């Protein structure tokens, strides 16, 4: 995409390309560049991080090892995997409002609608606007040579062109985690065993999604094991839940169109129809498609993704990618492009295929007005996961399911726990895909600040909001572009606040960070509290007192927070639990109680509401109305902690549940 010189200037510096946005070139063209924040990776996260630093009045640069700006958000992923859209705040939310404004031709405002489907060039235009308004320089073709540390701090990073970047704070916003690795921060790759974190859907997972549903032989000569296996197929599969080093498959998110001016799918150099033998056999067995998705993003174009047992995912082609050199990654990129272009050529042209499949595929082509410098082909490989940091807080399946709740949230995630297939295996003489997991979650959940900064002592001035600390399956939920932007803004905010306070990222006051994040529109709690609303969960660290014995459980759904508690249907009259909220102001509040329902619950639970006028006792039936806020009435309360709600168990006829209370002013 062209960059008008009236808006910005482009310089070439020893092989690096620098885009200057309103900042004198001499300040950044030097051999040594010094700023307040150096951001590695011009992904959507990297852009947002630098913009946030500039909005906080500090200088920042983005250094990018490649030549593409915007990562997947401008690289073909135009149908945003957003989950609970209302939980997307801050600059991420602004980005999607700016997308809508671009299409509508209207100014963007804090109340503008958001749009989550878009053409790649529109996303690029929005990022250009953000960078230009903030005055953020972007350096391209900056590949790390050395990372220098003094004790636990990075002092500078040097590029292979000899240029040096210095700052008090650094951020790794790449999909690969190279800066994190060079800085000596602990990381992992591949899949943990379920036993590592007490999970249920990590490790090897032989399941039914994107699976061969018709019999296909894995052998070079169909049906003959003695002929050997076709390339890319493993002879056996480990038990579900077993750890390994495999990662979920990569592909390109193609921007396709059926417009008359579309670019036909090219036949790549090195094309070999034998690479698609499994697909040919699947079609012979009776499979008729679909072979890829065609989700509309506007302008008559699509965001096209993997779909089915044999599609655009190059399963097994990426195992070495996370730790590969830049040159080796370039080769992996090229191989993925050859594979996927060859697939589309095969589907559109191979004379053995039914005419209906060939004509349906050939009715699509690459959009001629997208990715114009690469022939309509996406310049960004979909790196679904690479390295993942291992820090003081590892996000796991338990966070995704809200069985645990981070006490130091810096943003929300809400997408399905999603892993694409990781390998092809032989099961009972037939080929099967392994690794695809698609498990829903209850709703938006918080991401811990400790998961985006290294463990204390490893590196004190580096934040890692993309390759954050998470298990393989939790990362499958977190790894969405809106979440990366959210976490990057929070990380940049932390970096600037820590610099101002002269403390490490690990020592930064979380209440101070949270206050600034909320002021900047970040969402740190879900559901979002309404004005005058106070919710107190049974798992809260203060405000909940117990008598007798209460047991934690998650066996019945509909609870608020990470769990609920019950009296085990014993010690009636002895077991009691009191919620004592801290109310911000005196006045009338409607009081709500929440529980989970079951036939074994008590139908006659006495609940004492302690208010300014005395004590009012209500009786609730916990066999019904579970998973919702049930009103106990409206009462007057003093400010502070004079009021409370007491659950009693005397003479109750079943399990008594304590989950959460809610006070709503007015």
Q: How should each PLM-predicted stretch be described?
A:
Residues 2-17:
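N-terminal secretory signal peptides and thylakoid transit peptides that target proteins
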Residues 33-43:
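Beta1/beta-strand and adjacent pyrophosphate-binding region of the FAD-binding site
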Residues 58-59, 64-146, 150, 188, ...:
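Conserved N-terminal/central alpha/beta ligand/cofactor-binding core
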Residues 163-169, 173-529:
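Flavin (FAD/FMN)-binding glycine-rich loop and adjacent Rossmann-like elements that form
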Residues 577, 583-598:
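A short beta-strand element within beta-rich, extracytoplasmic domains
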Residues 599-614:
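Short, surface-exposed beta-strand/strand-loop-strand elements in extracellular ectodomains
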Residues 613-639:
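Extracellular carbohydrate recognition and processing domains
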Residues 646-654:
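Short beta-strand-plus-loop segments that form exposed binding edges in beta-rich domains
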């Amino acid at each position: 995409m062209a960059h008008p010189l009236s808006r910005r200037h482009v310089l070439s510096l020893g092989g690096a390309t620098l885009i200057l946005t309103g900042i004198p070139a001499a300040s950044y063209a030097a051999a040594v560049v010094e700023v307040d924040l150096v951001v590695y990776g011009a992904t959507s996260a990297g852009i947002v991080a630098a913009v946030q630093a500039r909005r906080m009045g500090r200088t920042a640069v983005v250094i990018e090892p490649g030549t593409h700006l915007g990562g997947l958000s401008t690289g073909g992923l135009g149908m945003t995997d957003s989950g609970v859209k209302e939980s997307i705040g801050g600059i991420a939310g602004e980005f999607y409002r700016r997308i809508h404004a671009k299409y509508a031709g209207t100014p963007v405002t804090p109340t503008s609608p958001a749009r989550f489907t878009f053409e790649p060039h529109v996303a690029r235009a929005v990022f250009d606007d953000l960078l230009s308004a903030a005055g953020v320089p972007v350096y391209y073709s900056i590949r790390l040579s050395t990372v220098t540390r003094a004790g636990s701090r990075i002092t500078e990073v040097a590029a292979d062109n000899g240029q040096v970047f210095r700052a008090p704070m650094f951020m790794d916003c790449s999909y690969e985690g190279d800066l994190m690795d060079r800085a000596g921060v602990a990381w992992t790759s591949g899949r943990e065993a379920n036993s590592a974190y007490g999970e249920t859907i990590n490790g090897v997972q032989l399941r039914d999604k994107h699976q061969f549903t018709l019999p296909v032989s894995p052998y070079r000569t169909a049906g003959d094991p003695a002929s050997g296996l076709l390339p890319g197929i493993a002879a056996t599969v480990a038990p579900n839940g077993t750890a390994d080093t495999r990662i979920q498959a990569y592909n390109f998110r193609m921007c396709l169109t059926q417009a008359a001016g579309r670019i036909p799918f090219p036949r790549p150099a090195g094309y070999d129809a034998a690479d698609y033998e499994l697909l040919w056999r699947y079609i012979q067995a009776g499979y008729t498609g679909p072979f890829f998705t065609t989700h509309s993003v506007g302008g008559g174009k699509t965001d096209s993704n993997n779909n089915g047992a044999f599609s655009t995912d190059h399963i097994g082609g990426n195992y070495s990618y996370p730790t590969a050199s830049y040159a080796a990654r370039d080769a992996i990129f090229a191989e993925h492009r050859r594979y996927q272009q060859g697939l589309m050529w095969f589907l559109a042209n191979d004379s053995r295929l039914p005419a209906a499949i060939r004509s349906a595929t050939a009715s699509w082509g690459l959009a001629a007005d997208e990715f114009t410098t690469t022939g309509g082909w996406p310049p960004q490989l979909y790196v679904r996961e690479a390295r993942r940091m291992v820090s003081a807080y590892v996000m796991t399946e338990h966070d995704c399911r809200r069985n645990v709740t981070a006490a130091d949230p810096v943003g929300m995630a809400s997408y399905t726990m999603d892993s694409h297939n990781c390998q092809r295996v032989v099961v009972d003489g037939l080929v099967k895909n392994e690794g695809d997991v698609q498990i829903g979650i209850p709703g938006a959940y918080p991401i811990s600040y400790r998961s985006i900064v290294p463990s204390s002592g490893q590196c004190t001035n580096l934040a890692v909001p993309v390759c954050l600390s998470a298990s393989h399956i939790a990362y499958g939920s977190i790894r969405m572009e809106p979440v990366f932007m959210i976490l990057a803004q929070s990380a940049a905010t932390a970096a600037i606040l820590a610099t101002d306070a002269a403390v490490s990222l690990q020592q930064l006051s979380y209440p101070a960070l949270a206050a600034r994040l909320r002021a900047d529109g970040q969402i740190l709690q879900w559901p979002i509290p309404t004005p005058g609303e106070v919710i107190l969960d049974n798992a809260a660290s203060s405000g909940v007192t117990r008598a007798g014995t209460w047991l934690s459980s998650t066996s019945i759904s509909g609870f608020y927070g990470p769990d609920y508690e019950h009296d085990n249907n014993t010690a009636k009259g002895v077991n009691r639990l009191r919620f004592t909220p801290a109310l911000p102001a005196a006045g009338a509040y409607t009081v709500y109680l929440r529980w989970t329902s079951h036939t074994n619950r008590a139908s006659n639970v006495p609940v004492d509401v302690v208010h300014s006028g005395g004590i009012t006792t209500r009786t609730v039936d916990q066999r019904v109305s579970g998973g919702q806020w049930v009103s106990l009435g409206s009462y007057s309360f003093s400010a502070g902690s004079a009021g409370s709600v007491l659950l009693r168990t005397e003479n109750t006829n079943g399990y008594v549940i304590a989950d959460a209370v809610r006070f709503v002013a007015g």
